[in-house]
Amino acid sequence: MRVEGQLGDEVVTIKATSIARRLHGKSHYGKMYEDRLQLSLIEAAYLMERGKLKLMKDDDEVSPEEFISLLGERGLYSKYLVYRDLRNRGYIVKTGFKYGAEFRLYERGGAPGRTHSAYLVRVISENDTIHALDFSSYVRVAHGVNKKLLMAFLDDEEDITYYLVDWIRP
């Protein structure tokens, strides 16, 4: 079953139907408001790829190719690839914005409101430079909020390698 969503500047909005409530309640997509479900662009791309979302911009349908192109233009494509990989592995993935990370990751069986996220996920392309002070701050923030840091390195072939980073006291 496909639900229709409206593409805005930063989010996709879906009317609060039973399907939208199920997407949020059972699968933990987006943020539910009284009258609507609000999805991030990355969540919307994933649901679109899985055939669960028909995306509209005003009265025109947005094709999956157009939407993936939009993600690329906004610098979100690499984040989407990591999000998709983690979701396909059965994890609940939510924004990590307030922690300075791309995502928060819940263990399988965990969920927002029932458990705390276990990991913060940082997405790094293989050609990116990571400065030691930045890397140190990623680890310290994760440790400070009782989470582990998962670094997702994306290569030019779109393969992802994960490294679990933990803080230790010298």
UniProtKB/Swiss-Prot annotation:
Biological processes annotated in GO: tRNA splicing, via endonucleolytic cleavage and ligation
Catalytic activity: pretRNA = a 3'-half-tRNA molecule with a 5'-OH end + a 5'-half-tRNA molecule with a 2',3'-cyclic phosphate end + an intron with a 2',3'-cyclic phosphate and a 5'-hydroxyl terminus
Enzyme class: lyase
Domain of life: Archaea
UniProt GO MF annotations: lyase activity; nucleic acid binding; tRNA-intron endonuclease activity
GO CC terms in record: cytoplasm
Active-site feature positions: Y106, H116, K147
Annotated SUPFAM superfamilies: tRNA-intron endonuclease catalytic domain-like (SSF53032), tRNA-intron endonuclease N-terminal domain-like (SSF55267)
Pfam families, A to Z: tRNA_int_endo, tRNA_int_endo_N
EC number in record: 4.6.1.16
Keywords: Lyase, tRNA processing
PANTHER family documented for this protein: TRNA-SPLICING ENDONUCLEASE SUBUNIT SEN2 (PTHR21227:SF0)
Oligomer and partners: Homotetramer; although the tetramer contains four active sites, only two participate in the cleavage. Therefore, it should be considered as a dimer of dimers.
Family: Belongs to the tRNA-intron endonuclease family. Archaeal short subfamily.
Function of the molecule: Endonuclease that removes tRNA introns. Cleaves pre-tRNA at the 5'- and 3'-splice sites to release the intron. The products are an intron and two tRNA half-molecules bearing 2',3' cyclic phosphate and 5'-OH termini. Recognizes a pseudosymmetric substrate in which 2 bulged loops of 3 bases are separated by a stem of 4 bp.
HAMAP family for the chain: EndA_short
Protein name per its UniProtKB record: tRNA-splicing endonuclease
Organism: Methanothermobacter thermautotrophicus (strain ATCC 29096 / DSM 1053 / JCM 10044 / NBRC 100330 / Delta H)
